[in-house]
Each structure stands twice: as C-alpha cells, then as structure tokens.
Amino acid sequence: MARFSVCGGDDGEGPSNNNHQSRKRQRLPSIDENEEDAETSDAGSSGEEDEDETQNQGMRPESEDRGSTSDDSDREVVIEERRFGKFVNSQSSSSSKDSPLSVTLLDPDVLDCPICCEPLKIPIFQCDNGHLACTLCCTKVRNRCPSCTLPIGYVRCRAMEKVIEASRVSCLNAKYGCKESTSYGNRFSHEQVCVFTPCSCPILDCHYTGYYKDLNNHVRAEHKDDLISFVWNTRLTISLDLNKKTTILQEENDGHVIVVQVFRALHAVYVSVSCIAPLTPGVGRLSCRLAKITVDSLLKQGFMVKNIQKVTNEHPEDGFMLIPSYLFSGNDNLNLQIWIGHGRIFVHS
C-alpha cells in the first residue's frame, strides 16, 4: 500500500506535534467522533502517563513494534485517501497511460463540417461564437458564419484539429478482411481504393457478398455447374441464351469471374463483358475480344472489361459490342467467340 504523510513533515516528539496532528485529524469527516475524543484525552493526559506509555512501548517485542508501525501506516494511507475522496492504486503501470484510448461517439456527425456535412479536415476555422467550418465552406460563405453572421475563416480551432488528427477509424470493409485504419477525414479516400470492397455473387438467387477473391472461391465451390471455364488469351466459343441474359465464366487457374450479358434492342443485341472485382488500382484490368462469324461476314471488336461489384440489368453505356439482328437470324441463341486477357492486349487486335 502506498504511504502518504498526514502531518506534512518528520514525526516529532512532545505535545506540540501531538496537538498539531490531533487538530488536523479533527477536520476529517470520515473519522468517528469517538476516535477524536480518544485522541484528545490522550493529548491531555499527564506527562507521567506518557512516560509510562513510552517505557511500556520500549519493552514490547520487535515484531509487535513492526505490526504497530504497519497499522499506523495503513491508517495514514486510509486517512489520506479519504481526504482526497479517492483510492490510489500504487501498482498502476506507466505504460497504461501511453496506450490508445477507445472512444465511442454517439453522434459521429460532430466530426463533420456543419455547413457541407463532409468530414472535417485540417485546417478548421471557427468564428467568435465557436461555430466551425472547413476551408472550402469559409470560401463559399465569403468568410461570414451562416449561423451568427460573424466573420469566420481567420481563427483556427486548434482543439478540434487535434481531435481530428488523433482520431483513427477502421475501414468499413473490416468485416471483409481490411485491416487499414485511417484518420476520420480521409476515410472516404481510402474506401474508394480499398481492394476489400464487397462484391456480390452473380448467380441468380445467391446472396453471398464478400471480398472478390473469396467470392471467386465461393463461386467455384458452390456454383460449379453454372460456370463455363476459360483460359487466359485462349479462344472460347460460347452460345448465349438471349432469354437467360447472363452467362458466367471463370478462369481455370486464377478464378476470375467474368459476366457476359445480352440485351435485346429493336434491331440488334448488346453484348457486354464485365469482371466481378472492385474498381481500385490494386486490381488489374482485363480486356476482351468478341467475334461473330457467319458464312458471309465477320464482326469483331475489342474493348476493356469493366469491373463491377454487382450484376444489374441496366443497358451498358460502354464495354459492349452491338450485333445486328440479321447476323443471328432471329434465333434465341447467339454463338460468339471470345478471348480474355490481362491489360489492353485485345483492345486494338
């Protein structure tokens, strides 16, 4: 137990020190009145009794003296702890002070700019009434606080800047495997390039969502019968069902999942090719070449494969080939040749 000095100095001898100690203890509300009376009567006792007491104490065994000293020390500690209204833990390590503190915000909007509602970024400004604004908003409002019309944009709020600088948030894709943590103001910038952006299974009525590499394994394990295998840079002939609209391909080695979709138009068919993967620089891009061959004609086109996270039925705006209806004679099946590879290998071939 930690030791504290109640008297504030060395232990003295004589009645003057005893009276000083008694007066200090009388001011402690946690000590019983009986204790105070006993101390007062002890202080007022005759010198002979004190001398006898001293002689008797000198005749006590050493172990008893040590026990008495320990009791007095414990009593001093309790008095000091009660005096300050708290208990002191003397064994707390200094390392706990340096460890990060986890704080939960009940309203995360307090870290957003109240004008544009975007995450606050340094520098942060305040008016004389304490209203906050980011740099861009100070310019937009012409340095006039929209809450109180006082000037804003000249005085920085250092306290909020320290809070923003010290705040770290986990990526929204943490449950899919991302271990990155960023400052609160830059979290959107990371999420736009996070490779763990969730992707949905392209198989109809399957609700699996996860990291795109995990999704590749899921498709291979759970939907093997619904896939058509292909090899990079190798020609594959496929028959597209115009009523089914979607055909799923998977690369034999890497497991990349490719979605080929057909969309009917008035006198033509759109054929789009997409890859189930996030739109991030960390994921490589693919290209493809489509060819429609008949006895009298050849229609061929190369383009970049678009990365998507979920299959939709919207007509594509790019990354497709338009095939006139006369090339497939109005049948419900469209036979095509397709090549898929890394980079831009098939864009201009």
Curated annotation (Swiss-Prot):
Q: Give the residue ranges for region: SBD.
A: 163-344
Its source organism is Arabidopsis thaliana (Mouse-ear cress)
Q: What is known of its domains?
A: The RING-type zinc finger domain is essential for ubiquitin ligase activity.
Instruction: Cite the annotated pathway.
Output: Protein modification; protein ubiquitination
What PANTHER family does its record include? E3 UBIQUITIN-PROTEIN LIGASE SINA-LIKE 10 (PTHR46632:SF16), E3 UBIQUITIN-PROTEIN LIGASE SINA-LIKE 4 (PTHR46632)
Region Disordered: list its residue ranges. 1-77
Give the protein's recorded name. E3 ubiquitin-protein ligase SINA-like 10
User: What does the record give as the reaction this protein catalyses?
Assistant: S-ubiquitinyl-[E2 ubiquitin-conjugating enzyme]-L-cysteine + [acceptor protein]-L-lysine = [E2 ubiquitin-conjugating enzyme]-L-cysteine + N(6)-ubiquitinyl-[acceptor protein]-L-lysine
Q: Where are the zinc fingers (SIAH-type)?
A: 166-224
Q: Describe, by residue range, where the zinc fingers (RING-type) fall in the chain.
A: 113-149
The UniProt function text for this chain reads: E3 ubiquitin-protein ligase that mediates ubiquitination and subsequent proteasomal degradation of target proteins. E3 ubiquitin ligases accept ubiquitin from an E2 ubiquitin-conjugating enzyme in the form of a thioester and then directly transfers the ubiquitin to targeted substrates. It probably triggers the ubiquitin-mediated degradation of different substrates.
